C-alpha cells in the first residue's frame, strides 16, 4: 500500500518540461503587386491579419509547431493591395510531464507564444525591405485564443450555435 502511494505521488510530481529544440522559417512570401504605382497614392492602409497554428508529433514527446501569419494591406481609398506577407514560423519542441488538455494548451498557446516574436520581426523586416512604412504587429494573447477555442468546442458538443472569432 505504501509503495502504491509512493508510485502515485511520483507520477503526480512529474515535472513539466518544455524545451525548444529549434526555431526556423518554414515558408515566407512577400508580394507587392501594385508597386511602384501605389507610392503615388495617399497612405491610408487597411490591415488584414490572419493567424493559424499547425501541430504534429514528430517523435516521442517531440512536436513541430507551425505558426501561420498572413498580413494583407490594402489602401482605403482605392482598395489596391499594397502588400501581402505570408510567414510560416516553425519550431521543434520537446514537451514532457503533461498530457491531455494541458498538452493541447501548451501546443496551441505556449509554443506559438514563443514563435510569434520571431514571425513578427520577420514580417516587420520584409515590409521595411519593401520600403513601406513600419508595421508593428500587436501582441497576441494565445491563452485567450485557446480558451475561446475550448468554449466553441464545448458549445458545439452541446449543440449550441457559435460565432467565429476573427483577429483583425
UniProtKB/Swiss-Prot annotation:
Keyword hit for Protein transport: yes
Keywords tagged on the record: Chaperone, Cytoplasm, Protein transport, Translocation, Transport
Pfam families per UniProt: SecB
GO cellular component terms attached to this protein's record: cytoplasm
Any Gene Ontology biological process: protein transport
Coiled coil: none
Subcellular location as annotated: Cytoplasm
Keyword Flavoprotein: no
Highest taxon of the lineage: Bacteria
Any GO MF annotation of the entry: unfolded protein binding
Chief location category: cytoplasm
Protein family membership: Belongs to the SecB family.
Subunit structure: Homotetramer, a dimer of dimers. One homotetramer interacts with 1 SecA dimer.
Annotated PANTHER family: PROTEIN-EXPORT PROTEIN SECB, PTHR36918
Known role: One of the proteins required for the normal export of preproteins out of the cell cytoplasm. It is a molecular chaperone that binds to a subset of precursor proteins, maintaining them in a translocation-competent state. It also specifically binds to its receptor SecA.
Record's protein name: Protein-export protein SecB
Organism the protein comes from: Glaesserella parasuis serovar 5 (strain SH0165)
Species lineage: Bacteria, Pseudomonadati, Pseudomonadota, Gammaproteobacteria, Pasteurellales
Primary gene name: secB
Amino acid at each position: 500500500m505504501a509503495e502504491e502511494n509512493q508510485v502515485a505521488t511520483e507520477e503526480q510530481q512529474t515535472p513539466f518540461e518544455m524545451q525548444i529544440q529549434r526555431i526556423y522559417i518554414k515558408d515566407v512570401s512577400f508580394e507587392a503587386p501594385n508597386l511602384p504605382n501605389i507610392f503615388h497614392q495617399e497612405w491610408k492602409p487597411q490591415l488584414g491579419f490572419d493567424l493559424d497554428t499547425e501541430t504534429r508529433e514528430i517523435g516521442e514527446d517531440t512536436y513541430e509547431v507551425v505558426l501561420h501569419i498572413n498580413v494583407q494591406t490594402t489602401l482605403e481609398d482605392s482598395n489596391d493591395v499594397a502588400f501581402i506577407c505570408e510567414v510560416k514560423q516553425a519550431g521543434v519542441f520537446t514537451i514532457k510531464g503533461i498530457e491531455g488538455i494541458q498538452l493541447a494548451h501548451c501546443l496551441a498557446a505556449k509554443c506559438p507564444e514563443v514563435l510569434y516574436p520571431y514571425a513578427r520581426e520577420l514580417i516587420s523586416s520584409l515590409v521595411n525591405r519593401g520600403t513601406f512604412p513600419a508595421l508593428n504587429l500587436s501582441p497576441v494573447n494565445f491563452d485567450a485564443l485557446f480558451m475561446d477555442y475550448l468554449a466553441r468546442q464545448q458549445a458545439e458538443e452541446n449543440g449550441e450555435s457559435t460565432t467565429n472569432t476573427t483577429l483583425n
